[in-house]
């Protein structure tokens, strides 16, 4: 990938998980989960990588492992607000063109998937870029926890222009359904605009923050990849992550 945008990768990390207490610091083969994520984000080689956290303990551990971290406020209502605060602290002069937001609970994510999230900003007109995977499991099609992308195919069917995101089974009729992966790349100007918008009606109804951008007329393009990275939300997920890391994945 010929990278033309000066890019900052930010990883939000909080201790607020109720299902898995102290999740960012959960040990995975001798290393805290948040450090695994930072390692993989850095391996994507998109530029500077920073963990944004409201926890002094996370800050200390991340920096002890050789990564950069920054403290943010505790009272943010959304991850994008935390990302924007971190951006303004790290880069008040506006040197970075784009921001990649990698969730802090993806300890086995392939660095190539992180790189691919930036592609719709590199070679297209999108304001925001994200990722999707074609759904193969029938149970996922009706699972409201699996967010679906309703979009128009672009670029030889390797990309979609997002028209809507929903927890419902959509679109209706014959054809593929797509699982949204919550990893985002923002043009700096788009992130600045996004955080200044209030929560939108459809965002509040579906409980999907990205709908705020679509309702405001912003363009979101979706790069299609082959696999959904493992997100760690439960003890079973953590056990699975430990197995994968032990296997060298």
Curated annotation (Swiss-Prot):
GO terms under cellular component:
cytosol
Superkingdom of origin organism:
Bacteria
Give the location in the cell.
Answer: Cytoplasm
Query: In which pathway is this protein known to take part?
Result: Nucleotide-sugar biosynthesis; CMP-3-deoxy-D-manno-octulosonate biosynthesis; CMP-3-deoxy-D-manno-octulosonate from 3-deoxy-D-manno-octulosonate and CTP: step 1/1; Bacterial outer membrane biogenesis; lipopolysaccharide biosynthesis
GO BP terms in the entry: CMP-keto-3-deoxy-D-manno-octulosonic acid biosynthetic process; lipopolysaccharide biosynthetic process
Which cysteines are cross-linked by disulfides? none
Q: Name one GO molecular function term.
A: 3-deoxy-manno-octulosonate cytidylyltransferase activity
What is the role of the protein in this entry?
Activates KDO (a required 8-carbon sugar) for incorporation into bacterial lipopolysaccharide in Gram-negative bacteria.
Q: Which family does it belong to?
A: Belongs to the KdsB family.
**Full protein name:** 3-deoxy-manno-octulosonate cytidylyltransferase
